[in-house]
Amino acid sequence: MGRGVGLQSAKGSSTSGYVQRSLAHDNRDDKTGIVRLKNKNYELRKITKRSQKVDKPANESKDNGLKKVLVEHDKRREIEVQVSELRDSLEDKQDRNPDEWPDKRIDEECEKLRSTLLADLQEKEKYQKAYTPRSKRSSESSK
């Protein structure tokens, strides 16, 4: 072990020889409450890691484009799920009564539903672009 800490050899000690940091020892000064840096390099690395973690949300704009693409994909996927559910139900009706539900009519019904759902989605997106939530406005004004 380095720096004279721990066992020189774990052999015969019935332990692994691993030495843990003592959680009971506090590096705070009793009067001021400030942490004293005994192992300066380690403490400084720890502090810089914390500050880097805090800075990450500011770089969120890089991921914003990806998030928009994923959200749009999920919405379109939900539309396709609804269309496929309609197709399944119409095909079940076709099995019971083939003359009433030919394949062409099923395709037309599915396309009609898809077009109405896509139109609704585009209308919602138009309104979302016109309105910006207060939380976004306050973060943009602080920049």
Curated annotation (Swiss-Prot):
GO CC list: cytoplasm; Prp19 complex; U2-type spliceosomal complex
Positions of the UniProt region annotated as Disordered: 1-74, 87-107, 123-143
CWF21 domain ranges (all copies): 71-120
Coiled coil: 72-129
InterPro entries: CWC21, mRNA_splic_Cwf21_dom
Chain intervals with Polar residues compositional bias: 10-19
UniProt entry keywords in alphabetical sequence: Coiled coil, Cytoplasm, mRNA processing, mRNA splicing, Nucleus, Spliceosome
Taxonomy, superkingdom: Eukaryota
Basic and acidic residues bias: start-end ranges: 23-33, 40-74
GO biological process: mRNA splicing, via spliceosome
Cellular compartments annotated: Cytoplasm; Nucleus
Subunit structure: Associates with the NTC complex (or PRP19-associated complex). The NTC complex associates with the spliceosome after the release of the U1 and U4 snRNAs and forms the CWC spliceosome subcomplex reminiscent of a late-stage spliceosome.
Function field: Involved in pre-mRNA splicing. May function at or prior to the first catalytic step of splicing at the catalytic center of the spliceosome. May do so by stabilizing the catalytic center or the position of the RNA substrate.
Classification via PANTHER family: SERINE/ARGININE REPETITIVE MATRIX 2, SERINE_ARGININE REPETITIVE MATRIX 2
Family: Belongs to the CWC21 family.
Identification of the protein by name: Pre-mRNA-splicing factor CWC21
Species name: Candida glabrata (strain ATCC 2001 / BCRC 20586 / JCM 3761 / NBRC 0622 / NRRL Y-65 / CBS 138) (Yeast)
Taxonomic lineage of the native organism: Eukaryota, Fungi, Dikarya, Ascomycota, Saccharomycotina
Gene: CWC21
